[in-house]
Amino acid sequence: MIYFGGIMAIAYAKLYEIIAKYIKDEKRAEELYNAVVEVIKEEKIIVKHELKDELKNELATKEDIMLAEERILRYVDNRFNQLDKKMTVGFVILILLYILTNPNAIELIKLLFGVK
């Protein structure tokens, strides 16, 4: 009896039917069938490895994703640091402008520092 396991069961059954149709000797038909199935299995492994290699080259790996994540985090941190510096400079300028344009602020600063 011939085993037709897995997803390829229908294709293997059809293959055996075609072989049996042209080769009337059942033993020889089964030998040819087994040889063809063996070739299919060997080629399947080769194709599987080729496909795996091709997909590995085309798709992002976990390492690629981690590198991209690291670059994005560094970029965001850099932008936050730049923004923080700009905000600090802006506040210093704002305070200086307030002090320079407000006579009451100058008096308050003199009072706070004990300058008369």
From Swiss-Prot:
The keyword Transmembrane applies. GO terms for cellular component: membrane. It is found in: Membrane. It is a single-pass membrane protein. It comes from the Archaea. The chain crosses the membrane at residues 89-109. Keywords: Membrane, Transmembrane, Transmembrane helix. Its main location: membrane. Belongs to the M.jannaschii MJ0023/MJ0349/MJ1072/MJ1074/MJ1107/MJECL16 family. This is Uncharacterized protein MJ1072. It comes from Methanocaldococcus jannaschii (strain ATCC 43067 / DSM 2661 / JAL-1 / JCM 10045 / NBRC 100440).
